[in-house]
């Protein structure tokens, strides 16, 4: 009988982060609630993404979360049902009139506008292939939002939930999203091959907390919507 699951993830508030010596966050809490309902406790540790993948490779972790599914990863791991869908949007200063058309080449729509992006992060080919003339890299989402307010760039590409969380926490005003461009990614928990029973129990628990309302309660706890 499975009683404990060792999971890893990289720190990414408000989805998983450490506060007052405890790991909390939307994704962490959803996973914890899904497994708790099955009588399984979760032991989560946070590391850089590369360290997380290394721990999975050494089988020192049972699963990794907030991961996208690729053919290569699907060969290595057993993927859960969808944990949630993440969305990244272009943010701008309030009053700056700009909107996008998803059917038109992104670079041509940007013109002379600079875009703030996370260093080392892969978005979509349309964004990743933008030249240095368009992009300014920052090390954190907080730096992206502050850079936007300080006019380092006209647009910042930030996860919707992260932006909402940081703007409330840091009391940042004068920022809103630009319509017409959204990057959506489905996120999962990936379990070690051989732990299909754990994945199955998680999936059942996830369905149950979505049905009984706990899933939505977790999002609201952090000021977010599903």
Predicted features by range, described:
Residues 28-38, 94-104, 110-113, 121, ...:
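Extended ligand-binding regions for polar small-molecule ligands
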Residues 1-71, 75, 117, 137-138, ...:
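Extracytoplasmic small-molecule ligand-binding "clamshell" domains
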Residues 9-11, 85-89, 168-207, 225-226:
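Periplasmic-binding protein-like
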Residues 13, 23-33, 93-132, 136-137, ...:
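Bilobed "Venus flytrap"/periplasmic-binding protein-like clamshell domains
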Residues 32, 43-110, 120-121, 164, ...:
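Acidic, polar ligand-binding/catalytic clefts
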Residues 38-39, 59-60, 65-68, 83, ...:
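Sec/Tat-exported extracytoplasmic proteins
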């Amino acid at each position: 009988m499975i009683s404990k699951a060792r999971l890893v993830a990289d720190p990414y508030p408000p989805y998983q982060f450490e506060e007052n010596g405890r790991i909390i966050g939307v994704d962490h809490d959803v996973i914890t609630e899904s497994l708790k309902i099955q009588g399984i406790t979760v032991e989560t540790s946070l590391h850089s993404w590369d360290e997380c993948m290394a721990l999975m490779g050494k089988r020192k972790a049972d699963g990794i979360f907030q991961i996208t599914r690729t053919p290569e990863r699907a060969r290595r791991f057993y993927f859960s049902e969808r944990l949630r869908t993440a969305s990244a949007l272009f943010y701008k200063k309030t009053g700056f009139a700009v909107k996008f058309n998803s059917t038109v080449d992104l670079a041509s729509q940007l013109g002379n506008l600079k875009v703030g992006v996370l260093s080392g992060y892969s978005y979509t080919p349309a964004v990743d292939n933008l030249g240095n003339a368009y992009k300014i890299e920052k090390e954190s989402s907080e730096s992206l939002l502050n850079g936007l307010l300080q006019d380092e760039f006209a647009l910042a590409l930030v996860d919707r939930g992260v932006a909402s969380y940081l703007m409330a926490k840091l009391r940042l005003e004068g920022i809103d999203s630009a319509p017409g461009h959204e990057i959506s990614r489905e996120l999962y928990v990936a379990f070690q091959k051989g732990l299909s029973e754990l994945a199955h129990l998680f999936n059942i628990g996830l369905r149950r907390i979505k049905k009984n309302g706990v899933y939505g309660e977790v999002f609201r706890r952090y000021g977010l919507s599903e």
